[in-house]
Amino acid sequence: MKHISIADAEHYTWPSAIGSILCDGWHLHRSGALSVIEERMPPGTAEQRHLHSHTTQFFYVLAGELTIEVDGEEHRLSLSTGLTVSAQTPHQVFNRGSEDARFLVISQPPSHGDRIPANQVAPGA
């Protein structure tokens, strides 16, 4: 069994939907059935609104705070709180706080390759 941290995990960046700031992600665990990623979003950043056809995700805040819009309803998460987003549910994550938000995204099955921009989905679909 191997220990892992963000120091030795596979790292990637992704652009915020707001401005030109980059956010970070680290693959802590990746298998055919499960993905665990730690992400960092600087203040004032957001991801693109999207959904997953088959993937259920659980977001868990490690530092800072997140706002997650799920199917039109906003949920504010602070330290040590989490939220499940079911498959086929449009959602968007924002950092509206004043410090970096660090959080885990646990996806089952892994979400890579299963991401549909919400603007490509018919309302009520």
List where the protein language model places each region.
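Short beta-strand His + acidic residue motifs that chelate non-heme Fe in jelly-roll/DSBH
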Residues: 49, 68-69, 85, 91-97
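Well-ordered beta-strand scaffold positions
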Residues: 32-34, 39, 73-75
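Conserved short histidine dyad/triad with adjacent acidic residue
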Residues: 37-52
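Short acidic-glycine-tyrosine-enriched beta hairpin
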Residues: 72-87
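A short, N-terminal "cap"/entry segment at the start of jelly-roll beta-barrel domains
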Residues: 1-34, 115-125
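A short hydrophobic beta-strand segment most commonly corresponding to one strand
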Residues: 84, 99-115
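Glycine- and acidic-residue-biased ligand/ion/polar-headgroup-sensing regions
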Residues: 54-56, 60-66, 71
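Structural motif
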Residues: 65-67, 74, 90, 100
